[in-house]
Amino acid sequence: MTKMIDISAMPAELSEKNTLTARRLGIDTHEHAVIYMRADCHICRAEGFNNHARIKVSGPSNKAIIATLNLVVTDLLSPGQIGLSETAWLRLQLNEGDPVRLIHPAPLLSLSAVRAKIFGEPLDQNNLDAIVGDIAAGRFSDIHLSAFLTASAAHEQSFEEIRDLTLSMVNVGQRLDWGRAPIVDKHCVGGLPGNRTTPIVVAICVAAGLTMPKTSSRAITSPAGTADTMETLAPVELDVSAMRRVVETVGGCIVWGGAVALSPVDDTLIRIERALDIDSDGQLVASVLSKKIAAGATHLVIDMPVGPTAKVRTEEAAARLEGLFARVGSNLGLNLKIMRTDGSQPVGRGIGPALEAWDVLAVLNNEGHNVPDLTVQATLLAGELLEMGQAAPAGRGAELATELLVNGRAWRAFEAICEAQGGFREPPTAPHYQVIQSPRDGVVGRIDNRRLAKAAKLAGAPASKAAGIVLHAKLGSQMVKGQPLYSLHSQSLGELSYAHDYLASQPEIIEIEEEQCPR
Amino acid sequence: MTKMIDISAMPAELSEKNTLTARRLGIDTHEHAVIYMRADCHICRAEGFNNHARIKVSGPSNKAIIATLNLVVTDLLSPGQIGLSETAWLRLQLNEGDPVRLIHPAPLLSLSAVRAKIFGEPLDQNNLDAIVGDIAAGRFSDIHLSAFLTASAAHEQSFEEIRDLTLSMVNVGQRLDWGRAPIVDKHCVGGLPGNRTTPIVVAICVAAGLTMPKTSSRAITSPAGTADTMETLAPVELDVSAMRRVVETVGGCIVWGGAVALSPVDDTLIRIERALDIDSDGQLVASVLSKKIAAGATHLVIDMPVGPTAKVRTEEAAARLEGLFARVGSNLGLNLKIMRTDGSQPVGRGIGPALEAWDVLAVLNNEGHNVPDLTVQATLLAGELLEMGQAAPAGRGAELATELLVNGRAWRAFEAICEAQGGFREPPTAPHYQVIQSPRDGVVGRIDNRRLAKAAKLAGAPASKAAGIVLHAKLGSQMVKGQPLYSLHSQSLGELSYAHDYLASQPEIIEIEEEQCPR
């Protein structure tokens, strides 16, 4: 009835039995690799694969991934077939009918380090290398990723942990070497809608002869990331060789970091942070610095808006984050400067990928008077980099930056970058909009960045490129009842309605204060 | 180009446009509800649904669920069709071709409470009601569930939080009222492989005339839960009315708690805890007590094995957990007793659903001499309940329990329970096994419960019912080199090989110490 078997003779035999024929089902499961197998498949029985099991899958290319099993109880698949989601199919570089092999994955050893962190133990470089390596290899499910990020937020990460995490994140991807210095870079810690200085700063620095190979993120919890905005102006999904060609040709670029595999786990972590709407200090520092170090940056300016509804709300929080950035950065050999900026209201007029792109174009085309705050912010940041990179004398950076805007050289540099990345294009405009009017006479007294950003997201940003908000007033603006305060833009009626419902449920996001002492 | 629209006129219009035709794809996505839509579907565009969006879905039955969107880029679906996973299909009670309506779900407001907990703020009853309610409604993704459990483990839950969580978990499901007292119950905090006393205790208590409507869990991180074991002896997936009928007829039952919707979020939380391999004190107390209170228990005995490789490792940890159980239990009106038991080695011989069932049958059939430790443990626990329930005088419970085993009344009560639940059946045996022999002469000095449990899981338990481990020696057993120490049992060669590889990579799980002073 039961029989005794010789284990040592098994592997070869198994390797042939565990093969199925690949079929592209065309199901896009986002970042998750999913495989579909018939519930009556002999391999499920033989290997004890249960529904939702994590399975190691390999094809003829010899690449292997960990995928989640979904069982199929109808005739969607023929016997002997295995269905693969788009992500699984593309990662394994399969062709229709290829043989696919399935085995149990090795146990997820780094999970014990995650558990230790949950219970408050710090993680060392080995732990973090193991965790980040397993994330990069796709071995962490959403459950594991969320636990790692939650534990990291729950127990404040030490300086050593953040530095080690940064290094782990750099080491698991490519690291660019430009064979020269300085390589300048900038980053904004975000939280301020519309603060889209990057394309302007890159254009100015490149116009001044500096090398600025900028990789940017998509939005984490905001209505637009720089990559989202830049994508409305030119292609941003360049691979490393294309990025290198652009930078060698024109001196700079503005591309999506995710496509060049610099700090590749960052985007995975960002997806989870977005779902949880958290972004801890340690994770933020590691995310930013790993990207910069991997991109080969030597000199970095960090724009840190501070304000009651910005990401960094108080001067104390700013000082803590600044200290972390400075300490980790200098420890890793990065020349780093932090500029605290005014985070009390959005910068520019637009909030959302395309709407912010229109503001960028205004500044570069000498229509900066329409968005004076964005113009000032961009020239200050660019000026700092011009000085750090010795393209301008100390104290004269901002002046040179302004000059490069006015004389059109920054615009020409930007055009050259867009052309080199695949061609300049005009940002889209939204088919639907709704104007929110001032409910009374008075002065704009407060603007809630967070709820404004939320409304922009409900309107469809950043996924709907043209969606978002346009501000028609800023802090201190004199308003007359019925005058446009801001407008919602969206690509669909459903989204417009959704954003509108949210606004209707909220107190004023832009507060109009009646003047106390009318003249 | 852009047009202004009247928002107030939209909803009715949208409700007709947002309808697709249901198609059962037969894809089993486990607990997750998934919907499949063509990437070119007009609703995706109109509503701004992105890949992996969470969408509120409803059918003609008026039930609504939150499902995850997967886009389909091939002709798997015709235009106008929507595919639904098995979970989504069954929850919505659809028929082929039914109209299905899609809208944006309301924002997940309870997520802000989860974030507060991540950053160390305690949760109150309102927060917990909101979180548990959203979990019960399927609004939490794996990412959210994992963050909630991780945060709860990272910041020790206060007594108040655990009590409130327990109540939230009770209130979100059914609560049974048996119209009489006492209603006795037992629970083991687990961590000790093979400790399958429950079926024996229920049989004894029912034989003594007590009412014991026992609901049990499936395994969390162990090779078998009581429900897994009981399922090899009789059906356990009874709904509440079937459970009630069984208890009214024979005085007790042993059913799977998940099927009767008592504390329904518990199984969802357990799935995540299993993936993370964590089980915090607070979560454990809430999980156990919510099930017992919902089941209508008035008197509860908790078996708490303590040992270096049990779930509770030290007397300090036991005291802490005991204090939590006692305080939360009495606060919620439960008469509760905790018995610390020896957790230094497995109880009985078998580890795994069916292998443990065979041990249970041995005790009930007066072959308890083969599993003396299981017999003693079960009669002590049953004795305590007999005394609490006033079926035995103080100090005489264990004696009566033994008598009911010996005179066959416990066995007859067990047979009656199995019959009432749908019929007794014999547990399966595994087609493959491998014996691990003693590497030397000596005495069994230590047994590592955790690694033994892990090996049993790698062999396929609990999903493969017949899989697991049989111990041929216990602590203190005299061994001769080559004598059987334990054996691996599995339903597939793949699993046997997998468990074997693990054992080969480990130091001895059962340590044989050479005798220092041979006589």
Swiss-Prot record, chains A, B:
Q: Mind telling me which InterPro entries this protein's record contains?
A: Glycosyl_Trfase_fam3, Glycosyl_Trfase_fam3_N_dom, Glycosyl_Trfase_fam3_N_dom_sf, Nuc_phospho_transferase, PYNP-like_C_sf, PYNP_C, Pyrmidine_PPase_CS, Thym_Pase_Put
Identify the keywords attached in UniProt to this record, alphabetized.
Glycosyltransferase, Transferase
Q: Which GO terms describe its molecular function?
A: 1,4-alpha-oligoglucan phosphorylase activity; thymidine phosphorylase activity
Enzyme Commission number(s)? 2.4.2.4
One biological process term in Gene Ontology? pyrimidine nucleoside metabolic process
Coiled-coil-forming residues are none
Report which reactions are catalysed by this protein.
thymidine + phosphate = 2-deoxy-alpha-D-ribose 1-phosphate + thymine
Transmembrane residue ranges: none
Q: Which GO terms describe its cellular component?
A: cytosol
Family assignment from sequence similarity: Belongs to the thymidine/pyrimidine-nucleoside phosphorylase family. Type 2 subfamily.
The protein in question is named: Putative thymidine phosphorylase
- Origin species: Maricaulis maris (strain MCS10) (Caulobacter maris)
What does the record give as the organism's lineage? Bacteria, Pseudomonadati, Pseudomonadota, Alphaproteobacteria, Maricaulales
